[in-house]
Swiss-Prot record:
GO cellular component terms attached to this protein's record: membrane; plasma membrane
Assigned keywords, A-Z: Cell membrane, Glycoprotein, Membrane, Transmembrane, Transmembrane helix
Family designation: Belongs to the Casparian strip membrane proteins (CASP) family.
Keyword presence, Cell membrane: yes
Name this polypeptide is given: CASP-like protein 5B3
Organism (species): Oryza sativa subsp. japonica
UniProt lineage: Eukaryota, Viridiplantae, Streptophyta, Embryophyta, Tracheophyta
């Protein structure tokens, strides 16, 4: 069995999960605090996707902490298969939500100039939330690849 960076039950795995939680939570807070986000489906989808990512990552971070405290091995093929599927599903959902929200944000900023016409829209917060969502996705993608690599090595 290989020692893969970011595998469950390791410090690197826990740090990946905690980073996912922090950035997903920050993305949700930035978007939820923006005026008028609920009028646009892509932004609601971003909140739902980042909320799901937050819950998934928090659960796995807690599992990593438990594993580190009790020195249990989480490299069971069935358990790692569950992690692989969960990571890939949340990675795809998060990337789709971040991309859709980025498209709407660019449309507002550059194409139709909604941000100038309607200054009450929080376009800066929309942008911040999208940036945080893409950072979250980069951590999720790293985790998904390492889980897949670990599964292949079991």
């Amino acid at each position: 069995m290989k020692d893969v960076v970011g595998s469950p039950g390791t410090w690197s795995g826990m740090s990946l999960r905690v980073s996912q939680c922090v950035f997903a939570g920050a993305s949700v807070v930035a978007m939820a605090s923006a005026y008028g986000f609920s009028n646009y489906t892509a932004f609601c989808y971003l909140i739902a996707s980042m909320g799901l990512q937050l819950l998934w990552s928090f659960g796995l971070a807690c599992l990593d902490i438990y594993s580190l405290q009790t020195k249990r091995d989480l490299h069971n093929p069935v358990l790692v298969s569950l992690f692989v599927v969960g990571d890939w599903v949340t990675a795809i959902l998060s990337f789709a939500a971040a991309s859709a929200s980025a498209g709407v944000t660019i449309l507002f900023e550059r194409d139709v100039h909604f941000c100038r016409m309607y200054p009450q829209l929080s376009c800066g917060r929309y942008e911040l939330s999208v940036i945080l969502a893409f950072i979250t996705w980069s951590f999720i993608a790293t985790s998904a690849v390492s889980m897949f690599w670990l599964l292949a090595s079991l």
